[in-house]
Amino acid sequence: MTFHRLVSRGKSDHTPAGEDLPVVRIAFDRPAIRNAFRPHTVDELYRCIDAARCTPDVAALILTGNGPSPRDGGYAFCSGGDQRIRGAAGYQYESQETSGDEDLATDARREHIEKGRLGRLHILEVQRLMRATPKPIIAAIPGWTTGGGHSLMVVAD
């Protein structure tokens, strides 16, 4: 996830250049796999939305997806849960040391699964937080959105 405070360019909004605007941009940052989320990504998204919700000088949130994909140049908002890590027990948390390694072999990946968190992909908790946030959450959709990504788009304002 990326989390940025928007900054004025000082042109048409009558705000001096470089001054913080009351808007936060939160973006999925896994463009190579259409911004699919993993359990750690869902945790980060929850923390980002909650931080913006609790910051008094933030008036709105923009939720989007980074891109383009280095594989084919395509853009995506979010393709939902990363099916490559979904096991028989559900989605699997990985240890921090392997969570960003896209090329780790499946057998090696299994050694790093956090056993106490098997099956836990709590996107519903993020959706509840989005609905309870009194600030508008704008879904800026740059391309594909499917599965859980589509649900986030629908829940946004």
Language-model features, listed with the residues they occupy:
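Conserved CoA-thioester-binding segment of acyl-CoA-metabolizing enzymes
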Residues: 1-71
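Glycine- (often His-adjacent) and acidic-residue-rich active-site loop
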Residues: 33, 65-125, 145
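Short, well-ordered alpha-helical scaffold segments within catalytic/effector domains
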Residues: 42, 46, 120-127
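Hydrophobic/aromatic residues within transmembrane alpha-helices
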Residues: 26, 63, 82, 152-154
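Glycine-rich beta-to-alpha active-site loop
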Residues: 122-157
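Short secondary-structure boundary/capping segments
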Residues: 15-16, 75, 129-130
